[in-house]
UniProtKB/Swiss-Prot annotation:
Native source species: Albidiferax ferrireducens (strain ATCC BAA-621 / DSM 15236 / T118)
Protein name, as recorded: Outer-membrane lipoprotein carrier protein
Primary gene name: lolA
Record-stated family: Belongs to the LolA family.
TM spans (from-to): none
Source species, domain of life: Bacteria
Biological process annotations from GO: lipoprotein localization to outer membrane; lipoprotein transport
Length: 213
């Protein structure tokens, strides 16, 4: 199953000229719920004599801080990733297979923690070393390096597009320990929408193969 990551737009006055780390701090403090569309491009390292393999997928994303989020991959294959606050559910529609993992054991040093799970910057700093990164492609970037060396995540960069009245979370770049790079781009973001109470509930479909880890 594909790994994931996260997004959103934070409307906030006075962020023009601020660094990416400041934009990340404001976003975590002020955006408690969010909803958006996303496109994800995953590039695997090139093998000898071959071009890098590129896969593109798209779908929707919702979150409610802290610790609840949902990715719904719609193209090219249907997959759902749902964190309900206790359990992280991964559902592959084509395989009719569900994987359930204890959320507290898997989310600390992940892209999801950066955007959707952590309640504040201090919580992020417990698991990541955070810093401003150089501007690139017209965006301001915050860099996050996991403090734990046990996981597969090597680094994350969060890109913000800043203006006079708003800072928009525009991109998320993820590099894993195998050299695979994932870039998520976000659109149609809604800031602090009122999400239905059952948005993050998940019940394995009848007949699905359920694997608990």
């Amino acid at each position: 199953m594909k790994y994931f990551a996260t997004i959103c737009i934070a409307a906030y006055a006075g962020l023009a000229g601020a660094g990416g780390l400041k934009s990340l701090e404001v976003f975590v403090k002020t955006v408690n719920t969010g909803r958006a569309d996303f496109t994800q491009v995953v590039t695997a390292p090139a093998k000898a004599g071959q071009a890098p393999r590129v896969k593109t997928s798209s779908g929707t994303f919702e979150f409610s801080r802290p610790n609840r989020f949902k990715f719904v991959y719609k193209k090219p294959f249907e997959q759902n990733i749902v964190a309900d606050g206790q359990t992280l559910w991964l559902y592959d529609v084509d395989l009719n297979q569900v994987t359930a993992r204890q959320q507290s054991k898997v989310l600390g040093s992940t892209p999801a923690a950066l955007i959707a799970a952590a309640p504040d910057l201090r919580a992020l700093q417990a698991d990541f070393t955070l810093a401003d990164a150089p501007d690139k492609d017209g965006l301001q970037w915050a860099a996050a390096t996991p403090k734990s060396k046990d996981g597969q995540l090597q680094s994350v960069r969060v890109g913000f597009r800043a203006g006079e009245q708003a800072a928009e979370l525009a991109a998320l770049e993820i590099l894993d320990s195998f050299g695979q790079r994932s870039v998520l781009s976000f659109s149609r973001f809604e800031v602090n929408p009122a999400l239905p109470g059952n948005s993050f509930q998940f019940k394995p479909p009848a007949g699905a193969d359920v694997i608990r880890q």
